[in-house]
Curated annotation (Swiss-Prot):
The organism of origin for this protein: Clostridium kluyveri (strain ATCC 8527 / DSM 555 / NBRC 12016 / NCIMB 10680 / K1)
One term of GO molecular function: tRNA binding
EC number(s) given by UniProt: 3.1.1.29
Annotated family: Belongs to the PTH family.
GO biological process, one term: rescue of stalled ribosome
Protein name stated in the entry: Peptidyl-tRNA hydrolase
Pfam families assigned: Pept_tRNA_hydro (PF01195)
Chief place where the protein resides: cytoplasm
Catalysed reactions listed for this entry: an N-acyl-L-alpha-aminoacyl-tRNA + H2O = an N-acyl-L-amino acid + a tRNA + H(+)
Length: 187
């Protein structure tokens, strides 16, 4: 069983913003594999289903970004998920739009949602897919809570589709294979 967590903020005003790319990812996986997030628990919305032969739980924390670790910890404890069976998807300002990176461990890199997950789990060793949203030329908060331009949104949709393939690869073949295959990806 895998726990797949997309990070974002709840509420209509955050829908499809740069900081909600993790929610966009979960929406795409949910649609592709017909997994409905119609249950409320773990301080968030979740659904269970299958991606190929892999049983998965898709989770969107409902705690706002900075407290995402509370939701993740509750789901991890309930399902007794091992760290290598939990995959977190989130935005990264240090990666250009049109790219993403897969990592199996690492610091929060200034991302408050990841910082809170590390705090709540007591480890930074867990797989993650970091989707590039580009570096701002303006105030960071305004940038991450802003929406993509029309052209950038088109590119983000392509990146999301490829990052779903990366998720499938992680589950089927392991994170090292996925990192070797996808970390050079660029539109």
């Amino acid at each position: 069983m895998f726990l797949i967590v997309g990070l974002g903020n709840i509420g209509v005003k955050y829908h499809r913003t740069r900081h909600n790319i993790g929610f966009d990812f979960i929406d795409l996986v949910s649609k592709k594999y017909n997994i409905t997030l119609n249950r409320e628990k773990f301080k968030g919305n979740y659904g269970e289903g299958f991606i190929g032969q892999n049983k998965v739980i898709l989770l969107k924390p409902g705690t706002y970004m900075n407290l995402s670790g509370e939701s993740v910890r509750e789901a991890v404890n309930f399902y007794k998920i091992e760290n290598d069976r939990m995959i977190i998807i989130y935005d990264d300002i240090d990666i250009d739009i049109g790219r993403f990176r897969i990592r199996h461990r690492g610091s929060a890199g200034g991302h408050n949602g990841i910082k809170n997950i590390i705090l709540n789990l007591g480890t930074d060793v867990f797989p993650r897919i970091k989707i590039g949203i580009g570096h701002p030329n303006v105030d960071l908060v305004s940038y991450v809570l802003g929406k993509f331009s029309e052209d950038d949104r088109i590119n983000i949709e392509k990146v999301l589709k490829t990052s779903v393939e990366a998720l499938e690869c992680i589950m089927d073949f392991g994170i090292e294979v996925a990192m070797n295959k996808f970390n050079g990806f660029k539109l």
